Regions:
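Active-site micro-motifs of SAM-dependent methyltransferase domains
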Residues: 114, 133, 164
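A short SAM/SAH-binding and catalytic strip from SAM-dependent methyltransferases
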Residues: 125-136
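Acidic/polar helix N-cap motif
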Residues: 114, 119-120, 137, 203
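Conserved strand-to-helix beginnings and helix N-cap segments that scaffold or border functional pockets
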Residues: 72, 120, 138-142
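Short glycine-/small-residue-rich Rossmann-like dinucleotide-binding loops
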Residues: 62, 131, 160
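Conserved N-terminal segment of class I S-adenosyl-L-methionine
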Residues: 1-119, 125-127, 249-254, 261-266
Length: 266
């Protein structure tokens, strides 16, 4: 199928084998740059509904902003980049590379167990992309995120489901070889973007336990476009079938929307 060459929609120079497969399977990618069941577009559409122009936003675990470098979909990049859409975007990460993130107005390197470098009730919105699965101290993370969030503010997090097949297999693979394995399973994935996993905040019950005392916790589960398939069309199709047949308990991803209680009743 011929593709519409629209550099303002889809950047072919950033297309990895997994993106190429997606474009073959889902014709609409050739129209808009993303598929009808794109999990990231769905999540960031929810976030966009919450975002206001005067908001101060924290990107928790912001990393280097790899989506700006690796994602061929212009729309998906725009949805994930909050800079210019709100008052200010702060970012923090354990990795010093966060200071190079082009989507942030300011960046801070943090340490587990130490207070985040922000005053109480600073942020209207906190976004976390695939970070919860790496958190080694959930009590610390939840406490600090709730501390720096304004009353009535939202924490929006996307993370794997602990009982999805990707997380189940991942827990069988030693962290020391995760990067090597993922580069084979998910062609185009760079080693610098792979980190040790803990899966301590990857069930709804885990998130409610750590955040629920001071916040309302909403979530949904999802299994969208396959991405762990070695670049094989056969495996891609097999994973599509698994996604359709699996009950929600075994969906690949979880999306959390956590609203801090507002004692003022607003």
């Amino acid at each position: 199928m011929a593709s519409v060459k629209r550099p303002d929609i889809y950047d072919f120079s950033k297309e990895a084998p997994r993106h190429r497969l997606e474009r073959k399977v889902y014709p609409e990618v050739n129209v808009s740059g993303f598929s009808h069941n794109d999990e990231e577009v769905a999540f960031f559409t929810q976030v966009a509904a919450l975002l206001r122009s005067g908001d101060v936003v924290l990107d928790f675990g912001a990393g280097r902003g790899e989506f700006m470098e690796n994602d061929p979909s212009i729309y998906r990049r725009q949805m994930q980049n909050f800079r210019g859409r709100c008052a200010r975007v702060h970012g923090c990460d354990l990795d010093p590379v966060v200071v190079e993130n082009p989507t942030l107005d300011s960046a801070e390197v943090i340490e587990v167990g130490k207070p985040l470098p922000y005053e109480d009730e600073t942020f209207d919105l906190i976004v976390s992309r695939y970070v919860f699965e790496h958190i080694a101290d959930p009590k610390w993370a939840a406490g600090e995120l709730l501390r720096v969030l304004k009353p009535g503010g939202w924490i929006c997090a996307m993370t794997p489901n602990k009982w999805g097949y990707v997380a189940l297999v991942s827990r069988l693979v030693p962290n020391r070889i995760h990067a090597r394995v993922l580069s084979k399973v998910q062609p185009g994935r760079k080693e610098m973007d792979v980190f040790p996993t803990t899966y301590l905040l990857n069930r709804p019950s885990d998130v409610r336990r750590h955040f629920g005392h001071a916040a309302e916790v909403y979530h949904y589960s999802t299994s969208g476009v396959p991405s762990y398939h070695f670049g094989s069309m056969a495996l891609f199709r097999l994973q599509q079938l698994i996604h359709r047949l699996s009950p929600p308990l075994f969906d690949l991803g979880l999306r959390f929307f956590i609203r801090k209680e507002d004692v003022r009743g607003q």
